[in-house]
């Protein structure tokens, strides 16, 4: 079970940092770019930063998948203040009990991602394609935690590959991809999953 300790949400060991408190402003920035509306699906609750920001928008419903028992209980307590929120104790990418959605936000931590989740090179690409094919309405928007290790050339290559993968896997859809570098000077030195200069806020708009 995950454990909240100091400024970090840890997984099965201290090497698995699920989330940290410094992410609050980054999460809020991603959600503000997404501008949630209609029915929203969020993968992962963590500290609830993105969930709370989603609730600031005029949404119809807000479904959150959270598999960890401790974080799930925290999410249930949080949801008492937000009648549009529905918490499902379920691990991504299981899509049982899910409907169709207008907006998606993806930030799970998967300690042992299997070959299926990594078939496109990273879990974010799998998330996009899975949702577009099975869960998205005709017009939909997506954002996710995006840390690209390296310089701007690597960032360009990452999003070029993402676009090529989308066009190959979902050829009948139209896409608009926007990405902005995030001022990540507040990332602490003991964070082991990203660092200053690696964070981006993506927005993918889809019509199908």
Predicted regions and their residues:
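Class I SAM-dependent methyltransferase Rossmann-like catalytic core
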Residues: 1-37, 49-52
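Class I S-adenosyl-L-methionine
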Residues: 14-17, 150-208
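Class I SAM-dependent methyltransferase core
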Residues: 42-46
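Conserved SAM-binding loop of SAM-dependent methyltransferases across substrates and taxa
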Residues: 47-59
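Conserved SAM-binding motif I beta-strand of class I
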Residues: 61-66, 144
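S-adenosyl-L-methionine
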Residues: 67-98, 111
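A short glycine-rich, Lys/Arg-flanked "PGG" loop and its adjoining helix->strand segment in the class I
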Residues: 118-138
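Conserved beta-strand signature within the Rossmann-like core of class I S-adenosyl-L-methionine
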Residues: 139-147
């Amino acid at each position: 079970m995950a454990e909240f300790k100091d400024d970090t949400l840890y997984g099965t060991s201290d090497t698995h940092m699920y989330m940290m408190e410094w992410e609050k402003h980054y999460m809020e920035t991603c959600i503000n770019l997404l501008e949630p509306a209609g029915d929203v699906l969020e993968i992962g609750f963590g500290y609830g930063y993105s969930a709370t920001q989603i609730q600031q928008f005029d949404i119809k419903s807000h479904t959150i998948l959270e598999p960890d028992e401790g974080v799930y209980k925290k999410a249930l307590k949080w949801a008492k203040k937000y009648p549009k929120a529905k918490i499902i104790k379920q691990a991504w990418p299981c899509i049982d009990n899910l409907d169709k959605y207008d907006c998606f936000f993806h930030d799970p931590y998967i300690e042992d991602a299997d070959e299926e989740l990594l078939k496109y090179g990273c879990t974010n690409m799998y998330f996009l394609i899975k949702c577009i094919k099975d869960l998205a309405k005709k017009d939909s928007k997506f954002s996710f935690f995006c840390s690209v290790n390296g310089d701007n050339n690597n960032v360009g290559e990452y999003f070029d590959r993402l676009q090529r993968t989308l066009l190959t896997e979902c050829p009948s859809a139209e896409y608009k991809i926007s990405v902005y570098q995030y001022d990540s000077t507040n990332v602490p030195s003991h964070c082991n999953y990203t660092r200053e200069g690696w964070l981006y806020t993506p927005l993918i708009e889809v019509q199908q």
